[in-house]
Amino acid sequence: MSGAPYTRPMLPAGTFSGRTIVVTGGGTGLGRSMGEYLSRLGANLVICGRRTEVIETAAQEISAATGGQVLGLTCDVRKPDEVEAMFAASVSRFGSLHGLVNNAAGNFICPTERLSYNAFNSVVDIVLKGTYNCTLALGKRWIAESTPGVVLNISTTYAWTGSGYVVPSAVSKAGALIMVRSLASEWGKYGIRLNAIAPGAFPTEGAWSRLRPPELGPNADPMKRIPLGRHGEHQELSNLAAYLLSDFSAYITGACITIDGGTWLRGAGQFNALEDVTGEQWDDLQAAMKRKKS
């Protein structure tokens, strides 16, 4: 097998045979990459998201690529009733659930004083409320059934350092990370582990267009802040996620592992460099975003 070691699958085939794992926001980007790898390792995979066509297409393509059982479900994690229905459908299909990846997210860059209340709430509702909606719904099932389980949150380093220009996301990710650590302590007695990953720059089509828009020029380029001098590869993030979901990490709980090439060591906040963006550039960006929506 060619390529650098970090671009290759790490865990042995069959690691998740007989287990079912749910990945929220699993139709695109990092969620899809993690889901496909879990399927390759033998997991029954459930991916969910708000866009039915995207989720169903992703489920079909992942199943075709891996030969695994993949269920795609439409679910808005902001709505507890939809979350409960999603888990019920997953149990109906696969019988039991063993892991959850809280990957669904929403984020965009903007000076905080330009944000509307609705814009702020839209991120909090998905990232913080959506994460605890899913975690509590599945955690309660596991506890009631005396079943162990694993939860993995996709976090960020600015959950503890803070960062300008992504304040709704920073607030939400910080709350979700504290929930991981708190529940790791509280639910350990039930055999439930909770951990988090804080990724750095892993290019994806959706997030990259919102967080690294070309309208902002070199101010939005993270490369100059990455000591290792490269972006992350999806496979190395998927390797870490699979490890934390597997029994190979059975003594790890309440942890948040950073995988960012050392970026956060060069200053708190991934987006604080946007301090150099002018008001006119922000105006141009907001105008471009409005044109894309229209």
Where are each of the predicted segments found?
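Alpha-helical segment proximal to the catalytic Tyr-Lys
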Residues: 140, 144, 185-189, 250
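Active-site helix of classical SDR
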Residues: 135, 172, 180
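Residue(s) in the substrate-gating loop at a strand-loop-helix junction
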Residues: 156
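Conserved glycine-rich cofactor-binding loop
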Residues: 20, 25-29
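Short, small/polar-rich loop/turn modules that mediate ligand/substrate recognition or access, typified
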Residues: 101, 188, 193, 252-254
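Substrate-binding pocket helix/loop in short-chain dehydrogenase/reductase
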Residues: 111-112, 116-124, 222
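C-terminal helical subdomain
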Residues: 6, 196, 216-252, 257-261, ...
